[in-house]
């Protein structure tokens, strides 16, 4: 990447859905979780540009070339009494890493958060991705080691939604 050309960041448009989808697939491949990336272009269009969008995306370009992206949504912190931004995905093409693309995406996200009165910017990182963790700490982010992320998907989510749980002591476990 030429040193005199910095990344340009802009919101994704509906016509960018194929580019966003391509980045999602590349991120899944990088994380060795391609099988989990079942998203389609129609899913991207509905989530980002449908009648009730649930997320937004930013694209980073170097010249005319897509260099990276971020997908994010707004959250709410009851403790702070303020909204926040959760960054679902952040990915930079390998050849553009180390050239300010990721930082430019995060700066843009922080600016959007400031404009909307957000009190925080949060994201998760795979625990083996030391390069990313070092980058995040270099910009001032702090790992939240006292928190553990839980997730319900598929059959477990369906069971809970249908009310099929039993109470055991102080914890709730799904029926088997």
What role is predicted for each listed range?
Residues 98-111, 138:
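Conserved acetyl-CoA-binding loop-helix of GNAT-fold acetyltransferases
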Residues 90-97:
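A short, internal acetyl-CoA/4′-phosphopantetheine-binding micro-motif in the GNAT/acyltransferase core
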């Amino acid at each position: 990447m030429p040193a005199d050309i910095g990344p340009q960041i802009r919101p994704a448009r509906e016509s960018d859905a194929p580019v966003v989808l391509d980045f999602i697939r590349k991120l899944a491949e990088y994380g060795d979780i391609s099988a989990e990336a079942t998203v389609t272009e129609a899913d991207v269009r509905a989530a980002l540009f449908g009648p009730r969008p649930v997320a937004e995306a930013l694209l980073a370009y170097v010249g005319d070339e897509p260099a990276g992206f971020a997908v994010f949504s707004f959250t709410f912190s009851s403790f702070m009494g303020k909204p926040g931004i959760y960054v679902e995905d952040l990915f930079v093409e390998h050849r553009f890493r180390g050239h300010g693309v990721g930082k430019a995406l995060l700066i843009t996200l922080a600016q959007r958060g400031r404009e909307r009165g957000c009190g925080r910017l949060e994201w998760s990182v795979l625990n083996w991705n030391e390069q990313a963790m070092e980058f995040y700490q270099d910009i001032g982010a702090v790992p939240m080691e006292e928190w553990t992320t839980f997730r319900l998907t598929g059959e477990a989510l369906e069971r809970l939604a249908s009310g099929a749980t039993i109470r055991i002591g102080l914890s709730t476990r799904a029926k088997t």
